[in-house]
């Protein structure tokens, strides 16, 4: 007597649906790579950007003492259990996601308070493209700690478009902002600190360095350095 075999039918429709969605599931980084040339050309069409410097900003000793206070639209938080003092804009200018792009600023340990005094007008500026940043409380770190000898400032960059993308205007403002930070420190003859092994920077950046924290680690390596130098965001900052 013949054995009846069950009728097994592969549902190809579901596979087709998944397959059709694959081109749309590009990561934010891949989208930025695909749009690199367009953004590169658009950025160069913008004139130089001039940032309005904030007045009546706190000095370094002030923010080391505060627990939580509002300054120039930024909430400053200094928890006793944290080595960092955090600043976050109450009404963010960039409504998109954080996709890992950030900058460090490395200063000689003894000059961190002075560096903050020099940069605070820009960091608190209403024109600043940076909605969130932090600075090391030097009273809470050891002499040779990573964020004691360098990387005392961290600037977090958020996207401003759908799909975690950056507009050309925001990228232009960030480029100009970094240039202003660098030039102010250089003009004031601030001594640079030791920039992190996890980061990359071009030769003309003396204080600022870049890292994408979602695609790298703190230890750094030759392979990681090469990968970071190929990041489209970083290239749009320096090329």
From Swiss-Prot:
Signal peptide range in chain numbering: none
Subcellular location: Secreted
Native source organism of the sequence: Shigella sonnei (strain Ss046)
Alphabetical keyword list: Lyase, Plasmid, Secreted, Virulence
Pfam families noted in UniProt: VRP3 (PF03536)
Taxonomic superkingdom: Bacteria
Protein family according to the UniProt entry: Belongs to the phosphothreonine lyase family.
UniProt main location, coarse: secreted
Active site positions: 104, 134
Described function: Catalyzes the removal of the phosphate group from the phosphothreonine in the mitogen-activated protein kinases such as MAPK2/ERK2, MAPK3/ERK1, MAPK8 and MAPK14 in an irreversible reaction, thus preventing the downstream phosphorylation of histone H3. This epigenetic modification results in inhibition of the transcription of a specific subset of pro-inflammatory genes, and ultimately to a reduced immune response against the invading pathogen. The diminished immune response enhances the bacterium's ability to disseminate and multiply within the host.
UniProt protein name: Phosphothreonine lyase OspF
Any single Gene Ontology cellular-component annotation: extracellular region
Gene3D superfamilies reported for this sequence: phosphothreonine lyase (3.30.2430.10)
Keyword Secreted: yes
């Amino acid at each position: 007597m013949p054995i009846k075999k069950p009728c097994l039918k592969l549902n190809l429709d579901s596979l087709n649906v998944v397959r059709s969605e694959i081109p749309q599931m590009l990561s934010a980084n891949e989208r930025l790579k695909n749009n690199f040339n367009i953004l590169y050309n658009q950025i160069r069409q913008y004139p130089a950007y001039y940032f309005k410097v904030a007045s009546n900003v706190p000095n370094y000793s002030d923010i080391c003492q505060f627990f939580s206070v509002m300054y120039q639209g930024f909430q400053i938080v200094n928890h006793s259990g944290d080595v960092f003092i955090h600043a976050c804009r109450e009404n963010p200018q960039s409504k998109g996601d954080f996709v890992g792009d950030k900058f460090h600023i490395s200063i000689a340990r003894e000059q961190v308070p002075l560096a903050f005094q020099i940069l605070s007008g820009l960091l608190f500026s209403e024109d600043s493209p940076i909605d969130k940043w932090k600075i090391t409380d030097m009273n809470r770190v050891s002499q040779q700690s990573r964020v004691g000898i360098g990387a005392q400032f961290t600037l977090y960059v958020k996207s401003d478009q759908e799909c975690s993308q950056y507009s050309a205007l925001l990228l232009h403002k960030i480029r100009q902002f970094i240039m202003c930070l660098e030039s102010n420190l250089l003009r004031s003859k601030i001594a640079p600190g030791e920039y992190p092994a996890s980061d990359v920077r071009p030769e003309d950046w003396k204080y600022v360095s870049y890292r994408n924290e979602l695609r790298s680690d703190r230890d750094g390596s030759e392979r990681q350095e090469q990968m970071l130098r190929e990041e489209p965001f970083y290239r749009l900052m320096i090329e």
